[in-house]
Amino acid sequence: MKLKKPYDLIVVGGGHAGVEAALISAQKHCSVLLVTMDKKAIGRMSCNPAIGGLAKGQMVREIDMLGGVMGPLADRSGLQFKILNRSKGRSVWSPRAQIDKRQYESIVMKTIINENIETIVGEAVELLIKNYKIMGVVLRDGSKIKSKSVILTCGTFLSGKIHIGDRKILAGRMGEENSDGITESLGVNTGKLKTGTPPRLDRNSVDWNRTAPTWGDDAPTPLSYQTREFNPPNDPCHTVRTNKLVHQIVGDNLDKSPMFTGDIAGTGPRYCPS
């Protein structure tokens, strides 16, 4: 593998954090290499295709004030925008956007290319360290890439595991391999966080007449302070309710749930952090 002179920065992982780290560094005229296990997955939205929400909306705007791109890119790919908690005081209002996830990752990739950030497909398994100083990374195939600094934004992929009922899959995300090795090379104690992911439904299989549509704001507010022209669509979300049959199905299958079998012992967050 032939790569140019040592980079100023290597970013490991191409999710939201990795994209922000790579872009802001490139804008500061650093030479940046983004290491990802799948170029098509850069900027991919794993779970609920939304940006913002309670607490997270404030974080998006803080990123925006620091020169980040999540806000403006979300404004360009949003399907519905809404300020949550309007029934309460303004201090707890929070912006949220439902996103076209495919359009979002497409815009992210174009932005990466426009900033001349180099990308390489590979799995970083070890840090190069000399005299307590970072010197680069080692890839799974043995390649060594040198840099002045490294930022790890591996997210759920580090020794990731997925539970589906009583099945367990080693994966960073559904359909994508996890990453092993670099965690051990860090020499620090690590822990795991858990989150639950909703099932995906084929929209053509849903009787929408039996659902209640919920709309975004009539006068939508962009997530980014950088956004000037803003006329997004207002696609509805749909609310459904459970019934006794659903409760019975859940109750009859609790013995297959990792939350109840002891396979997962952690308590999930009240509001999903993804």
Labelled PLM ranges:
Residues 2-3, 144:
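Short, flexible hinge/linker loops that cap or flank conserved catalytic cores
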Residues 3-17:
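Beta1/beta-strand and adjacent pyrophosphate-binding region of the FAD-binding site
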Residues 6, 23-130, 141, 149, ...:
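Conserved N-terminal/central alpha/beta ligand/cofactor-binding core
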Residues 8, 135, 148:
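Conserved acidic residues
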Residues 136-140:
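Short beta-strand segments that buttress and anchor functional surface loops
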Residues 253-274:
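Active-site helix-to-loop segments that bind/position phosphate- or nucleotide-bearing substrates
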